[in-house]
């Protein structure tokens, strides 16, 4: 009958009982229980003779005082005045007498009662007491009103009312202190608690009158009664026979006027409070009495007894009676689960033993085992004494935190060997047998297990020993086990809503003390010594002294508090100091916190990261802060919103450390509550315990996001609302100290916040959930360091990291990851979390070597979140056959896939995800059935019905059985599944159009309720649409089974009986507008080994005819193709078919039986065709192909005939339509369809960014071995190398391959099977190699290296071997010939030696090229070859770029990007042009050539430039703000000298050479018309001479003037008037370096400018000057007269080059030295007419 009780919840208020005149005798008054000398009770005459000479049942000294301060943990709530219900106040006698209640019989005899023992109908061993004699005894000072009998009462189910204590085996077992009476016509009266219902009354009709409402019940949280059998409100009438009579229990002495209150461990409680749910938490108490101040230490006046539970007041007559019980009994702590019975020894309680199979019913991972133990004790231990509490497990395999919590709870943990079979069960069975031998009935056994092996022991304990058996089991318990238990309870009730384990102790953080009123006239060292002596015994350290204040640091809060007491008001050099935890001013606080550890840390960055406990006085707290101890801040794991209020980890460290001072307040019950800045009535308030995160978080959000919320929060109305609404946030992770500041949603700080809008789930949690767990960072904190400079040696790098991190705390270890692909990382382990946070905040982006390291916290394998481990485990096991893997294979796959070690003990914590089973000689990791269904790769947003199908072509679904054929259309009516031979099935090959076939299949599925068996599909199709076009030649068709899977939304599933069924993917037709690609599955494979295997399968099947291969031929074909064996066990499988089915996104198995075929899936075929099509289109010159010519183009590109069935379809259009529109473009030209690559026109900015990207690619690949890298490594390597993402849209592309193909001059993409390799082009490779050779040779002694040592030194320097074949050479000598611009080979005695060549200065060459380009008239591009020719003509020396370190002149010009622009036209011709800035410089040079000495005042430059060029000078068009900045940007042309207004713009000497564009750029002479030019401006003192000059042969105007003036007397030149507008000449000598010559014959050899025809004025004849042989000769125009012989002179005998080097350097040297030798050369302005 146990556990079968029913409930009838009541809701109507029950009033006070009144004893009217017609009231029945059992309705007795409360005051009638006590006799007084002045008042004779109505029944005293009838009971007096039975109350003599009887021993007292309860001594007054055993009754504790109900008004004891310790017993009143919470004061009672105010109650309404009930004086009208009390009897007149009378003086009680010293020895009170108690009369029998109305339940006692009226006749002279009463039935005897058993007291103090028995239970059940058989009674117990208690003494027999006659109530009459007991109450009549004048010498007793006892209160022994007993109500009810000793019969067992029917209990309410403990599952429904766990905390109600009405499940009485016997009255003496639960309430042995209550006196019991027996009355045959009795009625069981129960309180109006809502959980109980009125039982049947005896045969007499009892009438309950309308009662007043019970204020006490309402305040205590009771639910009033409502349903009465009679239907009348407030009345109850029932008739019952004597056979239905049950004993009655008056449960509330105050409400039902039955018995005095029951004393529980020294506190006074009525029965209603005993039946209430247990108050195990202060949270519930705070919820019931939210506004009650802390209890007063003054004892309350003992006027009226009040129930400590519900607060109901009793009669004043009870005062003296209850006062008599307060004889010094010390009250126990409130909330103890045991029922303390006055005058009874604990050993008389029945024993109870708990036996816990913790391996079978385990504590959920990360949850508190303390709470589970507490819940077990609270539920079962009332009225019992704990005799045994044991759990059995392997302590080496169980979580250490769980074992520690069990030990702390005084639970016996028995260790067994987990590898031994049934070791835990055997140990528990032994403990059960010992318990039965030790204890006798009545006793209770609680077994926490689901193992059926305990059925035998439970049967014996219940039926042979008479024990009460309680079984706590899981859902999967066996009926054989459940049958032997008296009471069944699900284990999930104990583990539901378990709080997470939190660290047992918070890591210590430093605490600051601020010292004020220090003497200002003393030096800091003396004050520091004095303060150190005062604080040394408390572990203090003086951080800084500023003015009259100082800061001291202590290791924890306790030391700081002790130091504050000792140092307060101490004398320091005559001043009484003041010590405080908080600074006086905010500015002082900010200043000191930034200089807290200045003596240790010098860097300003590191100073900011001091971990300190910053403590505020209570006076600075907000008035809304409310004391609420016992709360724990917990955050929901579902929220990942990062708050914007926490700026850095340093702030988090400060806020976390603030909890240090508040811990003591929490212990005293004065915790602080941070109110949310929310003005709404639904504002929630997180409660903080031991963490200082929430308060600063919301305080900062109040200041930053809601400035107006401060006054709102401080309002009394809002304070009350916030105090009444209390929530908690649950943090399941042990990393909650860091996540707390990140996962609190910003919505919490919004004024319109509501619980529905918040992403956080707020739950009221049991305070026991706050039980701390061991610190997850007790063994150290791992810090991950990335972006490490891989150029440093490992030893050097390890030392640098050790030094950097040791400045912030103790470094336990520094580990470097393997040096692969230059992705070098480091793991630094520090001692505690605080030091790690400070190190992360300080060293993030700290430069070590040549890179800025990236630092972040890493929990590592030991601290990895179990939820993440569960997800990773599921992803691996879901790809495994039967979702199981051997443990060693699972560990190997896990570590290869995720790159870190796996702690096997963590796997045992995933009890809700996996199961580890012993099998044979090893362990097997299996996924539980509830987690085996793979989630849809499309996601819930793309899935039509939320199906978990993975959309693979071959799918095992929940089809337990399916008919092998369609009975309606199958042609073979005699088909039998038993007779059918799978090997006889022949796969049909069809030739159909997919566009026609797809709607037919959907229609066929519609008529067949969504499924069609594959065997009868041809028959069903023929019945609907006619016969299929089946071909007998398998090479000319497509397998029907594969062709069906090409239809979007249709799949072929395999039922569990092996029948293949055609069905819809989502069990219904797809929507009409669904993208076909959404119906294709993504790769479900996550195992790197399987990914590699899938690539190998694709590569193998591509070589097979029609991409079809029999399964039986796979192994030999694999061996023949790859030259290696295919070991199935290497992938974790035992059968080949299981391995093939593990890659369903790539491989499709066709047919059945032993003749199965394998082919590529349609998804893989489309991907393969797309790659081939793009390759074909890129091979075309026009990047397009006509469909009509597709076969021919395919043959030219791939050297094989086109066969569309190779790609699994029958029509080209079918597979082209599967390619996304973003990849190719189909267009119609005339009557033909054209396929082309879709390209988007890129903007000019994107083109410029692509050019910069090409430079990045060169830089990246130069750091890779052999200047190449895999394609799939490019993105991570780019991110790691440059510290930024490679965003394709930034360059105008959508695919990485397209971006890389856009720089063909830099990068090549090589295809090696399925893999793509990126490598530099040949030109870029040689550039990179040249840079390596320069670096290598410069590191050698003498910048040279023996040729034989080249390979060895190269490998030592760069870490990989040198390969000659990469450069298409066979020897080092041939290689050096290609690097002749960098190295040269010298023959030495010891052998050939490689040496660096001496490069010429590029600066002088740059100036010479600039002069050439600026002297050329025009803005158009100039061919590079012509520029070379003009250079060689001008300077009479070949231009060899190798001498300057470049292979070609184009590369040399590209190295000058700010001077010139180089471009290439469609004919691959290279042109060069000045940049816009140097076009401006060209104009400046021309302008300055018109001035004396090529200089001009700066303030006159703009006006002169405007007049000369004809346009206004705008510096902003060139990117500069002023003319001075603009001129400063062309230092190769001009420079500015002087100061203030006298600043002068001067032309550089290199730019003073004036070369005529007609003279220099004489190209294609025969194609250019003759042009004549005259010199018109000459001085008046001379005759005007007309000089006819041919194109390209005349000098510049200045040179002509100089030549003409040279023939005159120098006196005329010196005597010519100087214009007054010209500035004063600044004479400075231009030294002439004379070559060795015959100075005596100086006058006999006048120098004439070469290449110039001087016309004699008289003869008008041409005088050709000789030209050096080998240079370009000047052709005479057809209109010119015949050339006359040259005048006699040595010039005709000794010809000179066309332009001498001296002539180029200085225009003054071009003057013929004929008559006068000037002391210095001067620059001349053009001679103008005065």
UniProtKB/Swiss-Prot annotation:
Annotated region (Disordered), positions in chain: 655-722, 1667-1714
One Gene Ontology term, aspect cellular component: Golgi apparatus
Modification sites for Phosphotyrosine: 698
Pfam families: MARF1_LOTUS, NYN, OST-HTH, RRM_MARF1
Top-level taxon of the source organism: Eukaryota
Disruption phenotype: Female infertility due to oocyte meiotic arrest at the germinal vesicle stage: ovaries look normal, but oocytes do not resume meiosis even after a superovulatory regimen of gonadotropins and are ovulated at the immature germinal vesicle stage. Oocytes display strong up-regulation of a transcripts, increased retrotransposon expression, defective cytoplasmic maturation, and meiotic arrest. Mutant males are fertile.
GO terms for MF: RNA binding; RNA nuclease activity
Ranges annotated as biased composition (Basic and acidic residues): 655-668
Residues annotated with Phosphoserine modification: 65, 1081, 1083, 1684
NYN domain residues: 352-489
Functional note: Essential regulator of oogenesis required for female meiotic progression to repress transposable elements and preventing their mobilization, which is essential for the germline integrity. Probably acts via some RNA metabolic process, equivalent to the piRNA system in males, which mediates the repression of transposable elements during meiosis by forming complexes composed of RNAs and governs the methylation and subsequent repression of transposons. Also required to protect from DNA double-strand breaks.
Entry protein name: Meiosis regulator and mRNA stability factor 1
Annotated source species: Mus musculus (Mouse)
Gene: Marf1
């Amino acid at each position: 009958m146990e556990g079968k009780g029913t409930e009838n919840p009541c809701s109507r208020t029950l009033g006070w009982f009144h004893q009217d005149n017609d009231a029945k005798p059992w309705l007795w008054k409360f005051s009638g229980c006590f006799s007084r000398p002045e008042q004779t009770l109505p029944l005293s005459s009838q009971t007096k003779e039975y109350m003599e000479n009887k021993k007292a049942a309860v001594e007054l000294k055993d009754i504790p005082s109900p008004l004891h301060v310790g017993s009143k943990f919470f004061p009672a709530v105010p109650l309404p005045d009930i004086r009208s219900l009390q009897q007149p106040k009378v003086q009680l006698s010293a020895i009170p007498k108690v009369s029998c209640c109305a339940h006692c019989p009226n006749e002279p005899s009463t039935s005897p009662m058993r007291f103090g023992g028995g239970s059940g109908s058989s009674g117990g061993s208690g003494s027999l007491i006659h109530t009459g004699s007991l109450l009549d005894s004048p010498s007793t000072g006892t209160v022994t009103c007993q109500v009810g009998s000793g019969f067992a009462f029917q209990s309410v189910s403990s599952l429904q009312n766990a905390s109600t204590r009405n499940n009485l085996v016997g009255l003496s077992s639960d309430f042995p202190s209550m006196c019991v009476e027996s009355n045959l016509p009795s009625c069981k009266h129960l309180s109006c608690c809502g959980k109980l219902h009125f039982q049947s009354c005896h045969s007499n009709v009892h009438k309950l009158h309308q009662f007043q409402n019970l204020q006490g019940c309402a305040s205590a949280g009771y639910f009033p009664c409502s349903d009465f059998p009679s239907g009348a409100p407030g009345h109850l009438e029932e008739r019952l026979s004597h056979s239905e009579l049950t004993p009655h229990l008056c449960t509330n002495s105050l409400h039902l006027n039955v018995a005095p209150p029951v004393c529980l461990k020294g506190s006074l409680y009525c029965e209603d409070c005993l039946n209430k749910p247990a108050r195990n938490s202060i949270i519930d108490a705070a919820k019931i009495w939210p506004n009650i101040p802390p209890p007063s230490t003054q004892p309350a006046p003992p006027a009226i007894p009040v129930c400590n539970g519900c607060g109901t007041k009793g009669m004043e007559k009870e005062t003296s009676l209850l006062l008599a019980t307060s004889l010094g009994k010390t009250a126990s702590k409130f909330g103890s689960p045991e029922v303390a019975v006055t005058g009874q020894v604990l050993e008389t309680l029945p024993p109870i033993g708990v036996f816990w199979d913790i391996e079978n019913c385990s504590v959920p991972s990360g949850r508190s085992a303390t709470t589970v133990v507490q819940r077990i004790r609270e539920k079962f231990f009332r009225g019992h004494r704990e005799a045994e509490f044991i759990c059995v497990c392997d302590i080496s395999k169980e979580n250490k935190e769980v074992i520690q919590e069990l030990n702390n709870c005084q639970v016996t943990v028995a260790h067994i060997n987990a590898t031994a079979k049934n070791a835990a069960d055997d140990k528990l069975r032994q403990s059960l047998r010992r318990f039965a031998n030790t204890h006798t009935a009545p006793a209770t056994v609680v077994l926490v297990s689901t193992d059926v092996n305990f059925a035998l022991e439970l049967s014996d304990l219940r039926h042979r020993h008479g024990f009460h058996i309680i079984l706590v089991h899981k859902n999967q318990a066996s009926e054989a086990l459940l049958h032997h238990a008296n009471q069944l309870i699900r284990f999930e009730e104990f583990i539901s809503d378990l709080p997470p384990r939190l660290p047992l102790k918070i890591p210590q953080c430093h605490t600051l003390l601020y010292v004020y009123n220090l003497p200002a006239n003393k030096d800091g060292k003396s004050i520091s010594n004095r303060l150190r002596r005062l604080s040394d015994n408390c572990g203090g350290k003086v951080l800084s002294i500023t003015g009259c204040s100082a800061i001291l640091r202590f290791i924890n809060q306790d030391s700081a508090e002790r130091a504050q007491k000792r140092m307060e008001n101490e004398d320091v050099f005559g001043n009484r100091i003041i010590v405080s935890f908080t600074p006086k001013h905010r500015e002082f606080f900010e200043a000191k916190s930034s200089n807290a550890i200045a003596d240790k840390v010098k860097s300003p960055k590191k100073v900011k990261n001091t971990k300190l406990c910053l403590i505020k006085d209570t006076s600075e707290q907000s008035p809304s802060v409310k004391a609420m101890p016992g709360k724990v801040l917990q955050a929901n794991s579902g929220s990942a919103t990062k708050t914007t209020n926490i700026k850095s980890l340093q702030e988090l460290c400060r806020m976390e450390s603030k909890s240090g001072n508040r811990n003591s307040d929490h212990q005293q019950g004065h915790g602080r509550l941070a109110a949310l800045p929310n003005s709404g009535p639904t504002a929630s308030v997180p409660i903080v315990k031991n963490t200082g995160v929430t308060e600063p978080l919301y305080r900062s959000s109040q200041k930053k996001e809601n400035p107006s919320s401060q006054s709102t929060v401080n309002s009394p109305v809002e304070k009350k609302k916030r105090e009444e609404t209390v929530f908690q946030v649950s943090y399941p992770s042990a990393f909650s100290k860091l996540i707390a500041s990140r996962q609190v949603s910003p919505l919490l700080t919004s004024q319109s916040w509501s619980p529905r809008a918040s992403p956080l789930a707020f739950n009221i949690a049991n305070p026991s959930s706050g039980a701390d767990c061991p610190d997850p960072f007790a063994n150290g904190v791992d810090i991950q360091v990335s972006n490490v400079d891989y150029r440093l040696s490992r030893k050097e790098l390890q030392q640098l990291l050790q030094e950097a991190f040791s400045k912030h705390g103790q470094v336990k270890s520094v580990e470097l990851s393997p040096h692969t692909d230059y992705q070098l990382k480091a793991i630094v382990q520090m001692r505690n979390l605080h030091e790690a946070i400070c190190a992360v905040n300080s060293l993030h982006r700290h430069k070590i070597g040549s890179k800025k390291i990236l630092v972040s916290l890493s929990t590592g394998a030991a601290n990895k979140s179990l939820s993440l481990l569960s997800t990773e485990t599921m992803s691996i096991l879901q790809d495994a056959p039967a979702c199981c893997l051997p443990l060693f294979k699972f560990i190997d796959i896990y570590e290869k896939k995720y790159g870190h070690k796996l702690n096997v003990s963590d796997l045992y914590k995933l009890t809700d995800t996996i199961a580890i089973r012993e099998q044979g000689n090893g362990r097997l990791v299996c996924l539980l059935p509830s987690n085996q269904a793979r989630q849809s790769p499309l996601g819930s947003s793309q899935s039509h019905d939320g199906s978990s199908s993975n959309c693979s072509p071959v799918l095992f679904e929940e089809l337990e059985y399916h008919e092998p054929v369609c009975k309606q259309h199958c042609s073979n009516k005699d088909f039998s599944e038993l007779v059918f031979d799978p090997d006889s099935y022949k796969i049909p090959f069809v030739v159909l159009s997919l566009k026609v076939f797809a709607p037919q299949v959907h229609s066929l599925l519609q008529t067949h309720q969504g499924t069609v068996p594959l065997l009868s599909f041809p028959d069903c199709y023929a019945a609907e649409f006619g016969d299929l076009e089946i071909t007998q030649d398998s090479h000319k068709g497509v397998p029907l089974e594969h062709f069906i899977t090409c239809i979007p939304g249709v799949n072929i599933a395999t039922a569990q009986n092996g029948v293949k069924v055609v069905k819809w993917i989502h069990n219904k037709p797809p929507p009409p507008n669904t993208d076909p690609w959404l119906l294709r599955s993504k790769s479900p494979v996550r195992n790197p080994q399987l990914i590699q295997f899938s690539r190998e399968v694709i590569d193998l099947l591509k070589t097979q005819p029609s991409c079809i291969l029999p399964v039986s031929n796979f192994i030999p074909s694999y061996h023949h193709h790859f030259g290696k064996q295919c070991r199935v066990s290497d992938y974790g499988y035992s059968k080949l078919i299981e391995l093939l089915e593990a890659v369903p996104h790539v491989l499709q198995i066709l047919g059945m039986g032993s003749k199965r075929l394998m082919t590529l899936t349609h998804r893989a075929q489309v991907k393969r065709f797309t790659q081939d099509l793009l390759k074909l289109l890129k091979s075309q010159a026009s990047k397009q192909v006509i469909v009509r010519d597709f076969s021919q183009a395919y043959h030219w590109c791939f050297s094989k005939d086109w066969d569309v069935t190779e790609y699994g379809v029958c029509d080209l259009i079918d597979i082209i339509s599967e390619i996304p529109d973003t990849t190719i473009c189909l267009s119609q030209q005339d009557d033909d369809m054209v396929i082309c690559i879709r390209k988007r026109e890129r903007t000019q900015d994107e083109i410029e960014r692509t050019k910069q990207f090409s430079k990045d690619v060169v830089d990246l690949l130069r750091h890779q071995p052999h200047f190449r890298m895999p394609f799939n490594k490019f993105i991570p390597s780019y991110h790691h190398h440059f510290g930024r993402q490679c965003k394709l849209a930034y360059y105008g592309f959508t695919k990485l391959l397209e971006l890389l193909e856009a720089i063909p001059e830099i990068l090549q993409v090589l295809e090696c099977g399925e893999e793509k390799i990126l490598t530099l082009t040949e030109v870029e490779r040689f550039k990179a190699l040249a840079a390596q050779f320069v670096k290598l040779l410069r590191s050698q002694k003498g910048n040279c290296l023996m040729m034989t040592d080249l390979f060895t030194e190269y490998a030592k320097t760069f870490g990989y071997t040198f390969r000659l074949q990469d450069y298409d050479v066979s020897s080092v000598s041939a290689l050096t010939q290609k690097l002749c611009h960098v190295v040269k080979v010298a023959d030495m005695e010891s052998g050939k030696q490689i040496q660096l060549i001496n490069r010429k200065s590029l600066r002088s060459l740059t100036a010479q090229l600039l002069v050439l380009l600026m002297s050329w008239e025009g803005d158009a591009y100039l061919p590079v070859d012509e520029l070379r020719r003009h250079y060689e003509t001008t300077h009479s020396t070949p231009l060899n770029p190798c001498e300057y370190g470049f292979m070609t002149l184009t590369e040399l010009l590209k190295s000058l990007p700010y001077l010139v622009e180089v471009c290439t036209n469609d004919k691959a011709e290279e042109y060069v042009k000045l940049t816009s800035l140097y076009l401006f410089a060209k104009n400046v040079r021309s302008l300055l050539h018109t001035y004396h000495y090529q200089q001009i005042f700066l303030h006159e430059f703009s006006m002169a430039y405007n007049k000369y060029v004809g346009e206004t000078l705008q510096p902003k068009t060139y990117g500069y703000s002023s003319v001075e900045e603009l001129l400063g940007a062309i230092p190769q042309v001009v420079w500015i000298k002087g100061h203030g207004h006298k600043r002068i713009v001067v032309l550089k000497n290199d730019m003073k050479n004036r070369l005529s564009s007609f003279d220099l750029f004489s190209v294609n002479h025969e194609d250019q018309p003759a042009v004549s030019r005259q010199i018109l401006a000459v001085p008046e003192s001379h005759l005007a001479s007309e000089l006819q000059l041919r194109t390209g042969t005349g000098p510049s105007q200045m040179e002509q003037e100089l030549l003409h003036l040279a023939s005159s007397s120098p006196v005329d030149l010196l005597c010519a008037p100087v214009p007054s507008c010209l500035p004063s000449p600044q004479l400075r000598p231009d030294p002439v370096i004379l070559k060795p010559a015959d100075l005596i014959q100086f006058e006999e050899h006048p120098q004439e400018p070469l290449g110039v025809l001087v016309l004699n004025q008289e003869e008008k004849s041409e005088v050709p000057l000789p030209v050096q042989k080998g240079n370009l000769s000047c052709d005479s125009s057809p209109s010119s007269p015949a050339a006359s012989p040259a005048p006699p002179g040595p010039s005709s005998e000794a010809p000179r080059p066309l332009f001498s080097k001296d002539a180029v350097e200085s225009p003054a040297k071009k003057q013929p030295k004929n008559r006068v030798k000037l002391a210095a050369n001067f620059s001349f302005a053009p001679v103008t007419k005065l």
